[in-house]
A protein has these predicted regions:
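Rossmann-like NAD(P)(H) cofactor-binding subdomain of soluble oxidoreductases
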Residues: 29, 53-138
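Active-site-adjacent beta-strand anchor residues
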Residues: 5, 29, 75-76, 102, ...
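Short, well-ordered alpha-helices that flank and scaffold nucleotide-derived cofactor binding pockets
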Residues: 17, 21, 87-91, 114, ...
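Internal alpha-helical scaffold of NAD(P)-dependent oxidoreductase catalytic cores
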Residues: 92, 115-120, 135-192, 196-238
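NAD(P)-dependent Rossmann-like dehydrogenase/reductase catalytic/cofactor-binding core
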Residues: 217-308
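Short alpha-helical
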Residues: 34, 80-81, 106-107, 155, ...
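NAD(P)+-binding Rossmann beta1-loop-alpha1 motif at the extreme N-terminus of oxidoreductases
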Residues: 1-52
Length: 308
């Protein structure tokens, strides 16, 4: 399969390395020239959960157009860059090309569908999956639990199963689901509660949960998102969202979520797609979400210290 991966930071680099190492033709597209040059000159070094290896058959470019038509596009950018990534794909798409987006938060599929045919969009949810880039040309894979895939408009299909098989053959634990939006929302409420609080208060997930004050705020954040999802018609697999969030966080108490890592590195976060999205969807449902409005404002204030 010919695969174009747009956004080869930490997660995208893991996708590129494993998919290329299993025999697919993979193009890595990114604006980080130093990283691309290192991959081109020395291969992409992988360490950690998926094993030690150097993958040398990845083609790189700063322009998606250089890759030409392909079978699958994987958008692995930050949530804020999804729309721009979709607009860059004109030369990569045929009637059969599938576009898979794996992001935190809500709305990635909708942003892509403003530019591309939504009938060819697949959505993914990565769980227990972490990575970092210690230096250009080197990705460290912290963990790999499960990638869930589904059709944007629901249901099962042969093409969905085929894409899943390609990822499974590359070493990923992948399952397909008829209602991927349920799974996106279930991860979303955990990110809203724990990532939002961790980023706002500069805590690991365990520290958020151990402090009665921050844990109470985290619970309020998650409950707001849960109520909004229920109003929107999401069929959650659980009745107790607080217990679900607690179970999620307890699996990785030392984790620093991506929004906190972004703030520590003085980068823009994905707050608009996480806590900032809750009030937006709440308003559509005739609800409000004051805790998430407040946390989003706190994190945006932190961002303003280094983005203005």
């Amino acid at each position: 399969m010919k695969i174009v991966i747009v956004g080869t930071g930490a997660m995208g680099s893991v996708y590129a390395a494993l998919l290329a190492d299993s025999g697919n033709e993979v193009w890595a597209i990114d604006l980080w020239q130093e990283h691309l040059d290192a991959i081109n000159d020395h291969g992409l070094q992988v360490s950690g959960a998926s094993g030690e290896r150097t993958v040398r058959n990845i083609q790189v470019s700063t322009r998606a157009a250089d890759a030409g038509p392909c079978d699958l596009v994987v958008i692995a950018t930050k949530a804020s860059a999804v729309g721009a990534a979709a607009r860059s794909l004109t030369s990569n798409l045929t009637d059969e090309t599938l576009v898979l987006t794996i992001q935190n938060g809500l709305g990635a599929g909708e942003r892509i569908s403003k530019n591309l045919d939504s009938a060819n969009i697949l959505l993914g949810v990565a769980g227990g999956f972490g990575a970092s880039v210690p230096e250009p040309g080197h990705v460290h894979h912290n963990g790999m639990e499960l990638i869930r895939l589904g059709e944007m408009h629901g249901g099962m299909s042969e093409r969905l199963e085929h894409v899943a098989k390609v990822w499974q053959d590359a070493g990923f634990n992948v399952k397909t689901f008829a209602d991927i939006n349920q799974l996106i929302w279930e991860k979303f409420i955990c990110n809203v509660a724990l990532s939002g609080a961790a980023a706002a208060f500069d805590r690991t997930l365990g520290e958020v949960m151990d402090d009665p004050v921050t844990w109470e705020i985290a619970k309020k954040l998650g409950l707001e998102a849960y109520r909004v999802g229920k109003a929107k018609g999401i069929h959650f697999s659980f009745e107790d969202p607080v217990q679900y969030i607690s179970d999620f966080g307890s699996k990785m108490p030392k984790a620093k979520p991506s929004m906190l890592l972004d703030l520590m590195a003085k980068r823009r976060t994905e707050i608009d797609a996480i806590n900032g999205m809750v009030p937006v969807v709440a308003k559509e449902q005739g609800l409000d979400a004051p805790y998430n409005e407040a946390i989003a404002a706190v994190i945006k204030t932190k961002e303003s210290a280094f983005t203005n």
